């Protein structure tokens, strides 16, 4: 579980920085929010939207409860079936502008159909570390954004590599500078 938490957290943080690098207005807005005394709802929305677009664990599986009939054949009860969390999160019948980075979609407590937002799986076997992972991302991102400035180094096309986790490739290259402390 420690390894799973490490790799998924790393992938999530990398995707957040990749997305903020592509959306400088959102980046500037979240930096302003984390530096204010108030709670930053935008950071939570950015984390949720990053998890929607690029869920670190991009495939899930379920045991089929009853026979499932398809035009191509039958999946018998008891078999394991894999599903794509990545594609579920990009379903245009659920998500308006499904491929666009839009943290504001989480701003108003928008309800989605059951099992349409499942970055940590769902049901009784959902990831035990979900709350910890989101809290960790929030704390780490807030501290990094308060302490350093981040600028994309080059406009290299980043693509999603589907390995054990969904990772940005060739990586996220950023110029990182320490922000002088205000005393």
Go through the PLM ranges and name each one.
Residues 1-13, 27, 44, 63, ...:
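Conserved cytochrome P450 catalytic core segment spanning the I/J/K helices
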Residues 67, 83-110:
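Conserved cytochrome P450 K-helix/beta-meander segment immediately N-terminal to the heme-binding cysteine loop
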Residues 6-33, 130-147:
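Cytochrome P450 catalytic-core helices
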Residues 37-71, 92:
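Conserved cytochrome P450 K-helix E-x-x-R motif and the immediately C-terminal K′/meander segment
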Residues 126, 131-183:
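Cytochrome P450 proximal C-terminal region
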């Amino acid at each position: 579980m420690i390894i799973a938490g490490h790799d998924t957290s790393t992938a999530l943080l990398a995707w957040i920085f990749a997305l903020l690098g592509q959306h400088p207005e959102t980046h500037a807005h979240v930096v302003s929010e984390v530096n204010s005394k108030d709670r930053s709802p935008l950071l939570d929305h950015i984390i949720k939207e990053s998890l929607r677009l690029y869920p670190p664990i991009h495939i899930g599986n379920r045991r089929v409860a009853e026979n499932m009939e398809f035009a191509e054949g039958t999946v018998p009860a008891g078999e394991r079936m894999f599903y794509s969390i990545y594609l579920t999160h990009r379903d245009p019948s659920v998500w308006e502008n499904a491929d666009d980075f839009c943290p504001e979609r989480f701003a108003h407590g928008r309800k989605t159909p059951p099992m349409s937002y499942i970055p940590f799986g769902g049901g009784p076997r959902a990831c035990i570390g979900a709350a910890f992972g989101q809290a960790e991302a929030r704390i780490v991102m807030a501290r990094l954004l308060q302490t350093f400035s981040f600028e994309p180094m080059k406009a290299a096309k980043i693509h999603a590599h589907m390995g054990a986790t969904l990772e940005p490739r060739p990586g996220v290259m950023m110029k990182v500078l320490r922000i002088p402390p205000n005393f």
